[in-house]
UniProtKB/Swiss-Prot annotation:
This is E3 ubiquitin-protein ligase SopA. It is found in: Secreted; Host cell. Interacts with SpaK/InvB. Pfam families: SopA, SopA_C. Belongs to the SopA E3 ligase family. The N-terminal 45 amino acids are necessary and sufficient for secretion and translocation into host cells. This N-terminal region binds the SpaK/InvB chaperone. Contains a C-terminal HECT-like domain. Keywords: Secreted, Transferase, Ubl conjugation, Ubl conjugation pathway, Virulence. Residues 157-171 have a biased composition (Low complexity). Effector proteins function to alter host cell physiology and promote bacterial survival in host tissues. This protein is an E3 ubiquitin ligase that interferes with host's ubiquitination pathway. For instance, prevents host innate immune response by ubiquitinating and thus sending to degradation host E3 ubiquitin ligases TRIM56 and TRIM65. Required for inducing polymorphonuclear leukocytes migration across the intestinal epithelium. Preferentially uses host UBE2D1 (UBCH5A), UBE2D2 (UBCH5B) and UBE2L3 (UBCH7) as E2 ubiquitin-conjugating enzymes. It comes from Salmonella typhimurium (strain LT2 / SGSC1412 / ATCC 700720). One of its GO terms (cellular component) is extracellular region. It is an enzyme of class 2 (transferase). It catalyses: S-ubiquitinyl-[E2 ubiquitin-conjugating enzyme]-L-cysteine + [acceptor protein]-L-lysine = [E2 ubiquitin-conjugating enzyme]-L-cysteine + N(6)-ubiquitinyl-[acceptor protein]-L-lysine.
Length: 782
């Protein structure tokens, strides 16, 4: 171990220490080793001899002044000093063949100056709180009496014991830190001097370039017990590092990148901490103090230790600034509440969850008083800024997401100011989300926004029925959200009971269909029809549906069923067979319209209709065929002689000898972008088109129980025949193919109900190539 005798400024050392060092010098000049009798590293000798007053072997001929200085105050330190001297003696004896007596004397003197200064500093700091001595002598950042105990005597004294100067550049400081950290990583116990980086300059240093990757890994190596007091980290990058039991007092961390940096058990008092806007993930502070430290308004303080604030003045920053207290921490505020300041300081929904609101709220609940006081100061600042409603509007959601929750609801000042803000926020939610689905609620929304909406509906019960679309969505997400609390669910259930008792709602729930069939909701299963939406146009009309159905219709997939609900008029269930879903949603339940239309645009069956029935030649038929796809049942029938003849005129040219003509087949491939597709993919598409035309020919659309348009039946069978030619493997079996074919034509005594054929083919397609079916089959038929 290399020992450096850093220069000691004698003007600042207590007189007793000066005399002690002078005495040691004299003894080393005269050969200190000759006066050491026997030193044993025992636990009892020193304290026992002090108690009995007897002479101890450890109390050799050191001057009485040394004993007088240490005995009444820190006997343990004296013991370690004497042991160190013994180690020097032993080492010198081992190396005396190669080192002259004069050099030995110089080395002893240099080491004793350094060692006694360190021990004295350790004693002063622990006993009196005195500041570290100059010349590189310091103590551990956690103020614990561990510095001297961690010091290891030298193994092989070096001749280079002259004072070493501090690093002269950030690169040199970085090199020195790298060396110390790697030694610590290797298991070496560093002295306080080794870990002393006070007044260091790390400006513009990217620590990931000077330290091994293991220090940037999750649960990786830790920089532990270092003293960075009064150091400069401006424009440095300390991202992903973990500093434990470190001291940063009076340091400058201005524009420092500290993404995901962890500070634990550390002293960060009086620090200028303004980390860079390029910091992607907030640093964390675990059991760390930040007294009088200036913090940005976008910090996470969940692990900070707060103390009583002192009377210190706010910090001074370039350009000036306003500040509020959060316990003993300083939070920076904008000079003026401009539009940009409102967005930057208050809108965490627009700034990756970061705002001064979230910073204050990130403190644990044990600091509720400090949190409320800081929020009140913030509200006073906002009130003093005389902000208009238009200026506050973009941040209303952020404001209520924090201030409408405890402990801030306990403050009359905050509640009074927030009341109008929350009312405007609720009105905007009603206007926006009654007719469209709410965004998929994440953890933030479930825990911070849904409770506010419940509270707003509780205050304004009339909105439950006037904005039934929004209210049912709020209850739905409260009851199904995995991050909603039990308290939120209980309040939602209680509020829904009030809704069901409303005169506009109660007539629809006593029909043996609702909830648990007796007029009460059954929240134990998502299959129960617990939700009842009122028509936005007709108070006599309502929709009853289950939790699962409501969820899927608000956030549909290609397989979503759009008819799995009860349509009620005056409380009675009515058939939806001849009701167009798109018209029902547009007129009565617009909350589903956008989602339905979005799914409908992905269905491409209409392209084949446009190929066969061009609007120029067959405009009326084109409209009839497309309109029929918007409902499950059609009142238009095409089985009269004129209609049958007209359809034959259109379809017969496409089916020479009962098969698709090559030209028409190529038109189909082109329309569905299948020219270069595999035969199997072509076959799957033709199969699904056949299913749709089978539905056209059935009694549900253009046929009846006893008759159906032959042209449509023949065209459906031709599409299926071509699919079989391309890929028989997509069919259940050759027998099933033959059965379907016979049913289309009534051959071999087969039952000719094309409705049965359409249903059977549709079930097969949904099982084996559902994505193709979902891209073709009209939603109303799905």
């Amino acid at each position: 171990m290399k020992i450096s005798s850093g220069a000691i400024n004698f003007s600042t050392i207590p007189n007793q220490v000066k005399k002690l060092i002078t005495s040691i010098r004299e003894h080393t000049k005269n050969g200190l080793t000759s006066k050491i009798t026997s030193v044993k590293n025992t636990h009892t000798s020193l304290n026992e001899k002090f108690k009995t007053g007897k002479d101890s072997p450890i109390e050799f001929a050191l001057p009485q002044k040394i004993k007088d200085f240490f005995q009444p105050k820190d006997k343990n330190t004296l013991n370690k000093t004497l042991i160190t001297v013994k180690n020097i003696k032993d080492t010198n004896n081992a190396g005396k063949k190669n080192i002259s007596a004069e050099d030995v004397s110089k080395m002893n003197a240099a080491f004793m100056r350094k060692h006694i200064a360190n021990q004295t500093c350790d004693y002063n700091y622990r006993m009196t709180g005195a500041a570290p001595l100059p010349g590189g002598v310091s103590v551990s950042a956690n103020n614990r009496p561990t510095v001297s105990e961690g010091r290891t005597p030298p193994v092989s004294p070096s001749l280079s014991l002259q004072a070493t100067s501090s690093p002269s550049s950030p690169a040199d400081w970085a090199k020195k830190l790298t060396d110390a950290v790697l030694r610590q990583k290797a298991g070496e116990t560093l002295t306080a001097a080794d870990r002393d980086f006070s007044n260091a300059d790390f400006r513009n240093i990217t620590f990931s370039k000077i330290l091994p990757p293991s220090f940037m890994e999750r649960d990786g190596d830790i920089i532990k017990g270092f003293n960075f007091s009064n150091s400069k980290f401006t424009y440095s990058d300390i991202s992903h590092l973990h500093f434990d039991e470190c001291r940063f007092t009076y340091s400058t961390l201005s524009d420092v990148v500290c993404s995901n940096t962890k500070f634990s058990n550390s002293d960060m008092n009086e620090v200028f901490l303004q980390y860079s806007i390029t910091t992607q993930q907030q640093p964390s502070f675990i059991d760390t103090t930040l007294k009088n430290t200036l913090i940005r308004h976008k910090a996470n303080l969940s692990g900070v230790i707060l103390n009583e604030p002192d009377n210190s003045s706010p910090p001074s920053v370039s350009g000036g600034g306003n500040f509020i207290r959060l316990g003993d921490i300083w939070l920076q505020m904008p000079l003026l509440w401009t539009e940009n300041a409102v967005d930057g300081f208050l809108n965490h929904e627009h700034n990756n969850g970061k705002s001064i609101l979230m910073t204050i709220d990130s403190l644990p609940d044990k600091y509720s008083q400090e949190k409320v006081q800081a929020m009140e100061d913030l509200v006073k600042s906002l009130r003093g800024g005389r902000l208009t409603e238009a200026c506050i509007r973009p941040v209303e959601s952020s404001l209520v997401s924090v201030l409408a929750h405890p402990p801030y609801t306990q403050s009359a000042l905050i509640s009074e100011w927030l009341g109008p803000v929350q009312e405007r926020f609720f009105a905007h939610q009603c206007q926006t989300y009654n007719d469209v689905p709410l965004p998929a609620p994440d953890t933030y929304y479930q825990q911070r926004i849904l409770p506010v909406l419940l509270d707003s509906f509780d205050r304004n019960s009339a909105a439950m029925t006037t904005h039934s679309g929004l209210f049912n969505q709020v209850i739905l997400h409260c009851m199904t959200g995995v991050d909603c609390t039990d308290g939120t669910r209980q309040k939602a259930a209680a509020l829904y009971e009030q809704y069901l008792a409303h005169p506009a709602v109660s007539p629809h729930i006593h029909n043996g269909l609702f909830g648990n069939y007796d007029g009460s909701p059954d929240w134990t299963t998502r299959a129960a029809d617990n939700f009842l939406l009122l028509s936005s146009q007709d108070s006599d009309t309502a929709m009853m549906l289950s939790t699962d159905t409501l969820l899927t219709m608000l956030n549909p997939t290609p397989d979503t069923a759009w008819d799995n609900f009860y349509l009620l008029r005056a409380g009675e269930n009515v058939s939806t067979a001849q009701i167009s879903p798109v018209e029902l949603f547009r007129h009565d339940f617009p909350v589903f319209l956008a989602a339905f239309n979005q799914q409908a645009t992905q269905r491409r069956f209409g392209e084949l209709i446009d190929i066969i029935l061009s609007t120029e030649e067959h405009g009326e038929l084109n409209q009839q065929f497309l309109a029929a796809t918007n409902q499950k049942h059609s009142t238009v029938k095409l089985i009269d002689d004129a209609s049958v003849s007209r359809l034959a005129t259109i379809f017969d040219p496409l089916l020479p000898e009962g098969k698709l003509s090559p030209a028409h087949y190529q038109h189909i491939l082109s329309a569905y972008h299948l020219t270069d597709a595999t035969p199997q993919k072509q076959a799957e598409t033709l199969f699904c088109l056949s299913t749709a035309f089978a539905r056209y020919s059935s009694s549900a659309i253009f046929g009846t129980e006893h008759d159906s348009p032959p042209a449509l039946r023949g065209y459906a069978e031709a599409l299926m025949q071509k699919a079989w030619e391309l890929s028989p493997a997509i069919f259940p079996s050759s027998e099933q193919f033959t059965e379907w074919s016979d049913r289309f034509h009534g051959l071999h005594g087969a039952f000719t109900c094309t409705s049965v054929v359409a249903d059977s083919m549709q079930r097969h397609a949904r099982k084996y190539f559902p994505s193709v079916l979902s891209s073709i089959l009209p939603l109303a038929w799905a």
